[in-house]
């Protein structure tokens, strides 16, 4: 069985627990996911399950993807992801739903692409304190010294400088499943998840 599923981010909300405390949650629409391929040690060198998510139109996928999905008797799918398997593997072409993998109180990790922020300076990108705020200072939000002099006469790789921020694959771990809506395939996890509304995510048990 796979240890995770594919889904998309719906948005954030809040719910109340039995003690009346507010819990901020992220709502995820998870699955149903079809099994497009089952990998084995004999054929592939490792065990894994490839899942397909979200129907799409035929012209939006390549011919190779179309033939690959046809082997599992599946129509065009927008997203393919692979998960390491454990225990008995489901049959190719079968469908996995939320209740097959997750339960309330499970601890999970969620992977998605973070929001893109464009080109940002060191204060926003790396959290630098910046310089004095007074009028006499000519140094407010600049990077400052980069730590190189006549030897070695260059800036080392990896120095925290301005640049393109966000829009990177990010994983948030140790999120707790607070609630599950099986009818609408919704999973409510505590805390925040990378990305914007409709960002494709993967959710896995830890």
Swiss-Prot record:
What PANTHER family does the annotation carry?
50S RIBOSOMAL PROTEIN L3, LARGE RIBOSOMAL SUBUNIT PROTEIN UL3C
Q: Where is this region: Disordered?
A: 122-154
Tagged with keyword Transmembrane helix: no
Name the NCBIfam families on file.
Answer: L3_bact (TIGR03625)
Query: Pfam families annotated for this entry?
Result: Ribosomal_L3 (PF00297)
Q: GO CC terms on record?
A: cytosolic large ribosomal subunit
Highest taxon of source: Bacteria
Which species? Leptospira borgpetersenii serovar Hardjo-bovis (strain JB197)
Write the protein's name. Answer: Large ribosomal subunit protein uL3
- Which family is this protein grouped under? Belongs to the universal ribosomal protein uL3 family.
Q: Which GO terms describe its molecular function?
A: rRNA binding; structural constituent of ribosome
InterPro entries xrefs? Ribosomal_uL3 (IPR000597), Ribosomal_uL3_bac/org-type (IPR019927), Transl_B-barrel_sf (IPR009000)
Q: Which UniProt keywords are given for this protein, alphabetically ordered?
A: Ribonucleoprotein, Ribosomal protein, RNA-binding, rRNA-binding
């Amino acid at each position: 069985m796979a240890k995770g599923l594919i889904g998309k981010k719906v948005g954030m909300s809040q719910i109340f627990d039995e003690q009346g405390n507010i819990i901020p949650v992220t709502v995820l629409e998870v699955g149903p996911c079809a099994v497009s391929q089952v990998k084995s040690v004999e054929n592939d060198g490792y065990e894994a399950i490839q899942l397909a998510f979200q129907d799409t139109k035929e012209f939006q996928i390549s011919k190779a993807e179309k033939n690959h999905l046809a082997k599992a008797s599946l129509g065009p799918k927008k997203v393919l992801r692979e998960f390491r398997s454990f225990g008995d593997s489901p049959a190719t072409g079968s469908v996995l739903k939320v209740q097959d993998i997750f339960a309330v109180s499970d601890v999970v990790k969620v992977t998605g692409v973070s929001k893109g922020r464009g080109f940002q300076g060191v204060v926003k990108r790396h959290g630098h304190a910046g310089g004095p705020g007074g009028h006499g200072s000519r140094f407010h939000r600049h990077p400052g010294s980069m730590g190189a002099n006549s030897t070695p006469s260059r800036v080392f790789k990896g120095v925290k400088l301005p640049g393109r921020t966000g829009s990177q694959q990010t994983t948030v771990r140790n999120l707790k499943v607070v609630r599950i809506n099986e009818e609408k395939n919704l999973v409510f996890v505590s805390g925040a998840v990378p990305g914007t509304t409709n960002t494709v995510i993967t959710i896995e048990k830890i």
